[in-house]
Structures are given as C-alpha cells and as structure tokens.
C-alpha cells in the first residue's frame, strides 16, 4: 500500500520531473492507495499527512478531515497522525460487481489554508467466493443420432471475484462418450462445452451422469460442481441456429416501456415439431435483465419492461435460446449485447465540501470561505458542469480541478449586513441545459469595531432637595451597533469630583441599564448643581468606551422658615426700646429684619402684625420692609409697656413663618429734647455746672487716691512684663503712638440700635502687641458724657484675648458667638444736655485715665463721627427715623444668602477684623438715676 508515482524519466531530468509531479499531485489533490477487500476495521490504508508532506506538529492546526459522510462510511482519517484506515469491511463484489477495476474516491480537506485533496483507494479482490453454477443439477437430452464430435454448451460457473480469482478452467468427470472443451469468449471468460466423443447407444445406456467442476485461479483455489444428466433421445438431429451468435443493439435511456429492442430469428432445418421453435432467455441471463426486458416465446420479440437508466448501467447482456419441439428438442443460443445511450436527464449536483460559517467581518479580501464539488451523472457534454454565484454579493467563485472555491471579493461589514443568502447555480452543457440551485446562509460574525454612543451628548436631571437617597434622577442610554459581548454595555461614573468629594458619592449609576440614582439627600442651600461625567464601556476585546455629561439641578424646597435677625429672638431677656409718647403718627419705631435661606418665591418675605400684640391698632408694619411705625398718636391711657408681635411669612408652598416680638416702653420725654445722633457727634457738648462740680470733686479726691493709682500702675506694668497683657483689669494712660500704629490698626465701632444710641466702643487692634479700647457712654438723663479709656489689649495670648470677628468677649473672659450677644447696658443713656467731648466729666477713679493726647482724641472722634453720621442720616439706604437714629439691618427680605452673619444689632466699621468687646466686665443693668444728674458710673464695677 502507498501512493503510486508516475513513470520516471531518464537522465538528469529524472529528479526534477519527480519533484514536479509530486508537487502537482499535492496541489491537485491526487493520491492513490490500495487495500484488500474484507480487511478488518482499522487496517491502515496509507498516511495522508506523510504523503502530503505535512508535519506532525501542523496536523491539529490544519484540521485534516474527510470531505463527506459517504467517505466516512468506509474509511476513517486520524486527525493526530493523518493515517487513513478502514472503517468497516468492504465487499468488493457488492461495491463494484464484476468490474475489473474498483476505485473508491475519497476527499480529504485541510484548513489554514483550505485545500481539497482527492484520494483514490483501489479495492483489491480477495478470493473469497467459490465458483457456482446456476443449478446444482442439469438435465441434457442428446439424440442418439448425434454424431461424434457434437458439442453441447454447458452452463458456465459464476464467480463474483475478478482477475485471477475468477473461474480459470473446468474439468469433467471421466467418461468414454463425452469430453470437455473450454472456449474463451470475447470478454475473456471460459465457456465449457460437452463434446460427444463416440456415438451414443440408447439401448446400451440411456442415461449418462457427468460431474462438471469449475476451478478459479486463486490461492488457494476454489471450485464448484454441478451434476449433468445426459438423456439420450431419439433422433432429432438438427438444432436451431441464429444468424449470429452475438447480436449488438443500442437503445436510449428512458426508452418508454414496450419499446421493441429487437426480434430474434433462429432457423431449424427439421420439419414438423422438430422444426417448431420456442424462444426463451438463457440460463445466464441475470434477474435484473429479466426485469428490464421481456422475450415473446413465439415471435422472439424483445420489448422494454422497465426503466432504462444510463447512470445505472451503460451495458446489458441478454442470453437467448431457441428450442425446437422435436424429440428430443434441440436448441440454439445467442448473446444480445445492449448498449444504453445517454440522455441529458440528470441535473448537476452541488455538494458542499467545507464552509467556514460564520465568517469574521474582518476577513481579508480573497479569503477562501467555502469549497464545493459539482457532479453530473450524465456523460459527455451532458456531464460538463459550470457553477455560478448570485450577483451583487461580496463573494466570487474560483474554479479548480474537480471543485470550486468560494472567496470574499469585498470587505465585509456585519453592521451593514449580518448574513448573506448565497445562491449557487450549477448548469450542465447538455441540450437543453439542466440546472440545480444550492442556497446557503452565510453568517457574518461580529468584531468590536464600533464604540458605544450615547443617545444624548448632555443629559439634564432635576431633583427636589430633601429627597431620600435612592431617588431616580434620570436614565442615560447608549447604543452599540455591534452584537454579543461587543454590544454588552456597562455604565459607570467617571472619576470627577464635586466639592472635593468623588462624584460617585453623590450619584450611583446602574451598570446594566444606565439608571442614575441619588446617593444622598441634597440640600439646595449647600449645592445647587452637579456636573457628572457618565461613561459607558462595551465588553469587547479591546473594550471601547464613550462619555457623556449629566447636569443635575437641585430644586429648592421651602424647608427653611424665615430667621429673624432683629429684634433678637430671645426678646424676654432683651432691654425694651424707648418710645416717647409725643411721637407723631407714622414715626418709625423699629425695623424687623429677617432672612430666608431658601431661594426664589420661597425666600420672598412679608410682614404683618399679630393679634397677640398689646395694642394692635397702635402700630403698623410695612408688608415688604418690616418697618414698624405708629398708626396714631400716643394717648395718655395707652399702656406704658407695649408688646408688638410681628409675623414674618415666606411665599413658599406650604408657607413657613416666624414671629418677632418688640418690647416698647412709652416715655413722657419731649421728643424735642431727645438727643439726636448728629447732635453729640457734630457739636461739642456744653459743660453743665453739675459736670464742673464733679470735676472739682474728682480733682480733690485724686490726691487721696494717688498711692492707689501708683500701686495699680506698677501692677499693670509688672503684668505686661510677664507677657500677660490681657489678664490685668486696670486702665492706664498710653502715650501717643506713632503714625504707623494707626496705619496698622483695625478700628471696630459697635453701635446699638435698640431705639436710641446708648453706647459706642472703639477697639484698635494693631499688629504689635498692644491694643487700645475706648468706650463712650451716653444717657438721656445726664447732661454729660462718659468716655472711658479702658485698657491696653495685648495679643501675646491669643487664646485669652485675641478675638475673632465672629465672637465677642464676655465678662467672664470667655468667647461667645454674636448670636449670644448680651443686651446693652441700660444705664448708658444721655440727657438733652449731655454731649460727648474731648474730655469726660466722670470721676477719674471710676473711668480711668482719660486720653489727653490730641491725636488720640481727634482720631477717636473721627471714627465715632463717621459711624454715627451714617447711622443718623435719614436718607441713608439703611433707613432712618426719629428715635432710632436711622439704624437698621444691612439685609432685607430680598436677600437669600445661605450664611448671613448673625450680627444682631451690631454695626461694623469696614476693614475691622475684630468684634467689639466689653473688656471691662459685666455691664451695669441698674436703672438710671433721677433728674438730679447723678448716675451710677459703669467704670466703678469694671475696676473691682
């Protein structure tokens, strides 16, 4: 077994020709092997991989395989070794019949590249059949008048084997009357004849028994026998004869049933019954022939009985005989050879040998994606087949020997066309031509060549504040024209930050469907808008991605009630405001100031009086500004204390509200005698006699207290030397500082606006270690003004004395928020006659050393004048009115700042970085003295 090579050429071209022929055989796929029939399954036929020159390491990648299931019926091909082996026992006789050559075509397909190799396996005959006769016994009638040398044809033995394994010769049992003669027919088969060697004598022996043996040429030889009984008849010495022993006739396939093939004509010179002939098929006529043809015994006409198919058999052989009616009857024989003519009655067939399905859309142009075989069972021009492909497809057909290749002719795009319906048309060259269609569906597999794309470049979402976490904001959607994993999208939040925190801590996106949820509860007052970057990524390899922007707008909700800035919410602990009974209608009493942290309509504030007020008809409140004014003139029977309750309501839905309570004390002072803020700031106060008396008294007492002041001064100096500048509670005179000191100072003026100006404090905080604190006190009941030079402030201990802008210092030397500011000292009021000046009328023991430096005094008055004149200006934007010195809050209802400084009643000088403090300690809360001008000095308790 093994591949057969072509004849070798001589000379120096021998090697070159052999290599060329081998290469041609591999390219065209021609290999030939042989195997003996009836070989056991697993018998090696040949190694295809070795004969093709394939390496063992390439077998797995080349995927060596049989081309069709029909080949796999008889043979198997090992993918690991490339060995072609017998799959089941092969019976040559049932496969090829009496044909001398039995070839089985086998198709082998390899991949990478895709190739088709044609292999022919010759099935070698095995002497596995013995010769056999049609019948085990035959009776022959021979007339006694038969002459010596007469020949009588015997039945030939049939042996399905071929070649040397078929019938080789015959032998006859020994007999004195008969001998055996063997002739060779045209097809090479031996034909036995019984020869009469001597005259028969019926009276001597009426019956002769002969044994005919047929022996084949196999090794070992096989044989078969039949018993011949010769009956000697009376004379009928002429046998029928045909005009020719072999007759040849042709008939087209598909001839209609009943078609006359030919009419036999035999002659017998005898007369009577010995010359009357009957026709019949000979014993060697096969059953298949008997089914296709019929013989009329009387006329000898042969007609078609069944379908004649050229593809089934191209040749038929009919054995006919003519028998007379003599006694004994004699017969003659002839052979009719029938040639079947081809008709184009078979459409061509397209057989799919291999198909790469699906095909990657990235497959290069010219790649083989399928192999096809075509065949037509007709012959000649009727069997010539051409294969065409449907137009307008990115594929083409390339013919090769015995097969066609399907190649790509254009680039493929799955997103444009996911599959192709390919129709292959096979046509033969017959007339008329026959066609056969083969339709295949070729799928195009996806490659990740498309990035996902969001449906919108910008998404906008709105959410009300205070919504619980998990609230749905919106849904982002992206699409990917790819399929499978290449189109499976995953959404995520790209790592940007919002207010210094990761964006993922604010929102969460469902990675599968793109729904975006809130991660937390949003507060409009803290955050109005988020800018989020949402990304999407497919699951291809490598993955592709895209981004989009999401703007989340937080909508305001009316969740903040108005906050009252003035008057203070803790009105029960606040000092009441003074209102003279002589105030005319429309006089400004106070101004209620409130803010709302919400926005828009939710922050629009309106003011109204509540019935809880003591005298609701006495006062009016402006709906939009919050100004409280007298509605009528004050009467004598009006209560001395009035409580005005103002309702502050926002414009939200539902509306929220707060209340402000203003305490008023009605006084009998003449408004003409009430001091105005501009009076004591612009005109220097006139010294009354009472003030002069006080100065003289203080000068007298000062000598007695000199020792005490000296001791206190030494103690203060010692405290400054120890670095505790803020711990001493003494006041001393300070030399005039340099001009640079005031350039570096940050003055802070605090004015109380609860009806009348009661006290002012100025704090200078230079960058050096010393600070100065001045305070002036005015009382409506006194004719003088008290000015106290409190103490120097040291900044060496910031934890004790350095005050931040948002805090004030209490008497207990602790810091507190401005919202906790203590009420002003009610004793610090001034009378009509009292005016501030460059020197006070208070006792030096109570107020400390008064600044006598002209520069210090002028600077202090300038700062007081600048602040007080703005507060007293009736046309100021802050508002103004009698009795209030025109002071009002800086923020009205129209402002919606989120963090409004809770300055309460304080007014600040721009540029100051500190809050005015009462460094001297707790204010004196006692009521002022009577009209005799005597009042309790605040400086006394400050020096305890």
From Swiss-Prot:
Identify the SUPFAM superfamilies for this entry.
Cadherin-like (SSF49313)
Region (Disordered) location = 722-747, 812-853, 914-944
Q: Which UniProt keywords apply?
A: Calcium, Cell adhesion, Cell membrane, Glycoprotein, Membrane, Repeat, Signal, Transmembrane, Transmembrane helix
Where do the record's glycosylation annotations fall on this chain? 265, 443, 547
Q: Name one GO biological process term.
A: cell adhesion
Topology in membrane: Single-pass type I membrane protein
Comp. bias (Polar residues): 820-853
- Mapped to this chain, the residue ranges on the Cytoplasmic side of the membrane are 715-944
Provide GO CC annotations from the record: plasma membrane
Q: Which SMART domains match?
A: CA (SM00112)
Residue ranges annotated as transmembrane are 694-714
Q: Does the keyword rRNA-binding apply?
A: no
Alphabetical list of Pfam families matching this protein: Cadherin, Cadherin_2, Cadherin_C_2, Cadherin_tail
State its location(s).
Cell membrane
Q: Summarize the protein's role.
A: Potential calcium-dependent cell-adhesion protein. May be involved in the establishment and maintenance of specific neuronal connections in the brain.
Q: What is this protein called?
A: Protocadherin gamma-C5
């Amino acid at each position: 077994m093994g591949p057969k090579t072509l004849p070798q050429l001589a000379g120096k071209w021998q090697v070159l020709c052999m290599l060329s022929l081998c290469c041609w055989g591999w390219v065209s796929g021609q290999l030939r092997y042989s195997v003996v029939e009836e070989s056991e399954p697993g018998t090696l036929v040949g190694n295809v991989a070795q004969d093709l020159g394939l390496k063992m390491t390439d077998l797995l990648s080349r995927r060596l395989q049989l081309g069709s299931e029909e080949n796999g019926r008889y043979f198997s091909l090992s993918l690991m070794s490339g060995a072609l082996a017998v799959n089941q026992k092969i019976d040559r006789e049932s496969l090829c019949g009496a044909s001398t050559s039995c070839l089985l075509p086998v198709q082998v397909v390899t991949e990478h590249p895709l190739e088709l190799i044609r292999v022919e396996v010759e099935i070698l005959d095995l002497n596995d059949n013995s010769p056999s006769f049609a019948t085990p016994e035959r009776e022959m009638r021979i007339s006694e008048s038969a002459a010596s040398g007469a020949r009588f044809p015997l039945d030939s033995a049939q042996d399905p084997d071929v070649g040397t394994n078929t019938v080789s010769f015959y032998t006859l049992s020994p007999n004195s009357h008969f001998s055996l003669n063997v002739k060779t027919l045209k097809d090479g088969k031996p034909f036995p004849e019984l020869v009469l060697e001597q005259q028969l004598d019926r009276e001597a022996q009426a019956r002769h028994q002969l044994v005919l043996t047929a022996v084949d040429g196999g090794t070992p030889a096989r044989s078969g026998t039949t018993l011949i009984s010769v009956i000697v008849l009376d004379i009928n010495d002429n046998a029928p004869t045909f005009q020719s022993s072999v007759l040849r006739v042709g008939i087209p396939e598909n001839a209609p049933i009943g078609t006359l093939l030919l009419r036999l004509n035999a002659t017998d010179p005898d007369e009577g019954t010995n010359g009357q002939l009957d026709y019949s098929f000979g014993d060697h006529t096969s059953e298949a022939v008997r089914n296709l043809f019929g013989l009329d015994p009387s006329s000898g006409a042969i007609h078609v009985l069944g379908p004649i198919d050229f593809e089934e058999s191209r040749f038929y052989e009919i054995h006919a005989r003519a028998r007379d009616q003599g006694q004994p009857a004699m017969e003659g024989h002839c052979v009719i050879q029938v040639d079947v003519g081809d008709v184009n009655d078979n459409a061509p067939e397209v057989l799919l040998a291999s198909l790469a399905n699906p095909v990657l859309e990235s497959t290069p142009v010219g790649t083989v994606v399928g192999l096809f075989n075509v065949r037509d069972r007709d012959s000649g021009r009727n069997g010539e087949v051409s294969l065409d492909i449907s137009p307008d497809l990115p594929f083409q057909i390339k013919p090769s020997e015995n097969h066609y290749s399907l190649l790509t002719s254009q680039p493929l795009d799955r997103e444009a066309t996911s599959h192709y319906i390919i129709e292959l048309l096979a046509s033969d060259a017959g007339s008329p031509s026959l066609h056969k269609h083969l339709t295949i569906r070729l799928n195009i597999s996806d490659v990740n060549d498309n990035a996902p794309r969001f449906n919108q470049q910008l998404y906008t979402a709105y959410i009300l504040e205070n919504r619980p976490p998990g609230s749905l904001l919106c849904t982002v959607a992206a699409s990917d024209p790819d399929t499978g994993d290449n189109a499976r999208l995953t959404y995520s939040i790209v790592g940007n930050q919002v207010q210094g925190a990761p964006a993922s801590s604010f929102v969460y996106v469902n990675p599968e469907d793109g729904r975006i949820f809130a991660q937390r509860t949003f507060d409009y007052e803290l955050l109005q808008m988020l800018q989020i970057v949402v990304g999407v990524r497919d699951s291809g390899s490598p993955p592709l991605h895209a981004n989009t922007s999401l703007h989340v707008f937080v909508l305001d909700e009316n969740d903040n009630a108005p906050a009252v800035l003035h008057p203070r919410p803790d009105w029960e602990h606040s000092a009441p405001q003074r209102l003279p009974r002589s105030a005319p209608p429309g006089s400004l009493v106070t101004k209620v100031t409130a803010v709302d942290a919400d926005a828009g309509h939710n922050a629009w504030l309106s003011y109204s009086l509540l019935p809880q007020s003591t005298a609701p008809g006495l006062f009016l409140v402006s709906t939009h500004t919050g100004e409280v004014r007298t509605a009528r003139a004050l009467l004598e029977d009006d209560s001395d204390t009035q409580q005005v309750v103002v309702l502050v309501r926002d414009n939200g839905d539902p509306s929220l509200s707060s209340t402000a309570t203003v305490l008023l004390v009605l006084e009998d002072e003449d408004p003409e005698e009430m001091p105005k803020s501009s009076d004591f700031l612009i005109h220097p106060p006139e010294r009354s006699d009472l003030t002069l008396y006080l100065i003289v008294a203080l000068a007298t007492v000062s000598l007695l207290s000199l020792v005490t002041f000296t001791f206190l001064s030494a103690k203060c100096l010692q405290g400054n030397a120890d670095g505790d500048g803020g711990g001493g509670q003494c006041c001393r005179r300070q030399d005039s500082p340099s001009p640079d000191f005031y350039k570096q100072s940050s003055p802070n003026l605090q004015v109380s606006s609860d009806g009348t100006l009661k006290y002012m404090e100025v704090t200078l905080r230079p960058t050096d270690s010393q600070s100065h604190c001045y305070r002036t006190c005015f009382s409506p009941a006194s004719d003088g003004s008290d000015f106290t030079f409190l103490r120097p402030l040291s900044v060496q201990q910031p934890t004790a004395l350095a005050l931040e802008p948002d805090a004030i210092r209490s008497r207990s030397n602790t810091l507190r928020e401005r919202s906790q500011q203590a009420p002003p000292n009610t004793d610090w009021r001034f009378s009509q006659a009292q005016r501030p000046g460059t020197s006070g009328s208070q006792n030096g023991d109570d107020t400390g050393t008064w600044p006598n430096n002209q520069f210090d005094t002028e600077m202090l008055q300038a700062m007081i004048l600048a602040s007080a004149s703005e507060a007293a200006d009736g046309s100021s934007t802050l508002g103004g009115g009698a009795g209030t010195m025109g002071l009002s809050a800086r923020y009205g209802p129209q402002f919606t700042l989120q963090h409004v400084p809770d300055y309460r009643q304080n007014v600040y000088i721009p540029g100051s970085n500190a809050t005015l403090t009462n460094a001297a300690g707790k204010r004196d809360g006692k009521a002022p003295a009577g009209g005799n001008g005597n009042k309790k000095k605040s400086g006394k308790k400050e020096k305890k």
